[in-house]
């Protein structure tokens, strides 16, 4: 067997993450024993440790890479030796590759993950006008992916309109055109009704946040509907959309493809997407 792979996930509230299992199973299937550790700063072992201390510890211990999640995707940037152009433009990193010399490079596979999910799940979707509900969390990555995968006009709706406009400014600067505008999420249903598609980028639909981020009565069979939530896979939003006959994109595609792209960066190996999907869905 070849050299083993040591990976980790730094963030808060990581107990339900399916990423460790996907990486460990894929590494083993490729003949590389893989250990993927949760490094939870709300947990007993890493509690109270700052991000730099945890990153340094990973370097000293010979980690091959780290995934970074809430609340550290922005804070990690200045601690890295190098950051990809895309991640720099977005101001967010979710994947850190550590080479044999300890050199760290940051990437954002949330963007590529959502983009690949769109290509796979909505290959023929109309993209002239799209609404994204939610500007926090993975919102910047989703917006960037939408605009770079053919969306001509993207309206990002949030209850905090300043946050929505700040996201729009970041994406517009990154892509070099006025593709995104931030809008108020209150009364967004009229805007959605006139759009081609809508993406939920809020936590609404998760067990802790039941319901939908907007009134689904604005949807028709001509809309396509995406959701970043993957627990449950069929959210209330997607259930309502499918009942209308809408094309839909569930949150599993982004979750799986971000891990697929990260595994490739960590190891230099070509992951088997179907196998990683099978692992994800088995959990």
UniProtKB/Swiss-Prot annotation:
InterPro entries: Aminoacid_DH-like_N_sf, NAD(P)-bd_dom_sf, SDH_C, Shikimate_DH-bd_N, Shikimate_DH_fam. L-quinate binds at residues 17-19, 69, 73, 94, 110, 258. Shikimate binds at residues 17, 69, 73, 94, 110, 258. It is an enzyme of class 1 (oxidoreductase). NAD(+) binds at residues 137-138, 158, 163, 203-206, 213, 228, 251. Induction: By shikimate, quinate and QsuR. One of its GO terms (molecular function) is NADP binding. Optimum pH is 9-10. Gene3D superfamilies: Leucine Dehydrogenase, chain A, domain 1, NAD(P)-binding Rossmann-like Domain. The active site is at 73 (proton acceptor). Pathway: Metabolic intermediate biosynthesis; chorismate biosynthesis; chorismate from D-erythrose 4-phosphate and phosphoenolpyruvate: step 4/7; Aromatic compound metabolism; 3,4-dihydroxybenzoate biosynthesis; 3-dehydroquinate from D-quinate (NAD(+) route). One of its GO terms (cellular component) is cytosol. It comes from the Bacteria. It catalyses: L-quinate + NAD(+) = 3-dehydroquinate + NADH + H(+); shikimate + NAD(+) = 3-dehydroshikimate + NADH + H(+). Involved in the biosynthesis of the chorismate, which leads to the biosynthesis of aromatic amino acids, and plays a key role in the quinate degradation pathway. Catalyzes the NAD(+)-dependent oxidation of both quinate and shikimate to 3-dehydroquinate and 3-dehydroshikimate, respectively. It can only use NAD. Has a different substrate and cosubstrate specificities relative to all other known bacterial shikimate/quinate dehydrogenases. Homodimer. Belongs to the shikimate dehydrogenase family. This is Quinate/shikimate dehydrogenase (NAD(+)).
């Amino acid at each position: 067997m070849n050299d083993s792979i040591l990976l980790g996930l730094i963030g808060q509230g990581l107990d339900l993450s399916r990423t460790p299992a996907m990486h460990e199973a894929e590494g083993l299937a490729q003949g590389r024993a893989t250990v993927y550790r949760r490094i939870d700063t709300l947990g007993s072992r890493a509690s109270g440790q700052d991000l730099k201390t945890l990153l340094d510890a990973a370097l000293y211990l010979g980690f091959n890479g780290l995934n970074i999640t809430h609340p550290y995707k922005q804070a990690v940037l200045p601690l890295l030796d190098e950051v990809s152009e895309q991640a720099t433009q977005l101001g967010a990193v979710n994947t850190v590759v550590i080479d044999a010399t300890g050199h760290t490079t940051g990437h954002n596979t949330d963007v590529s993950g959502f983009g690949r999910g769109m290509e796979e799940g909505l290959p023929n979707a109309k993209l002239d006008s799209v609404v994204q509900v939610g500007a926090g969390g993975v919102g910047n990555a989703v917006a960037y992916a939408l605009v770079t995968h053919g969306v001509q006009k993207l309206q990002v709706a949030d209850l905090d309109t300043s946050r929505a406009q700040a996201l729009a400014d970041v994406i517009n600067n990154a892509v070099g055109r006025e593709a995104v505008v931030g809008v108020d999420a209150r009364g967004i249903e009229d805007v959605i009704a006139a759009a081609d598609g809508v993406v939920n980028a809020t936590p609404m639909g998760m067990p802790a946040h039941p319901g939908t981020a907007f009134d689904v009565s604005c949807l028709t069979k001509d809309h396509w509907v995406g959701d970043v939530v993957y627990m449950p896979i069929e959210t209330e939003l997607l259930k309502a959309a499918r009942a209308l006959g809408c094309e839909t994109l569930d949150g599993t595609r982004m979750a799986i493809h971000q891990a697929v792209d990260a595994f490739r960066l960590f190891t230099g190996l070509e992951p088997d997407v179907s196998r990683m999907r099978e692992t994800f869905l088995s959990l």
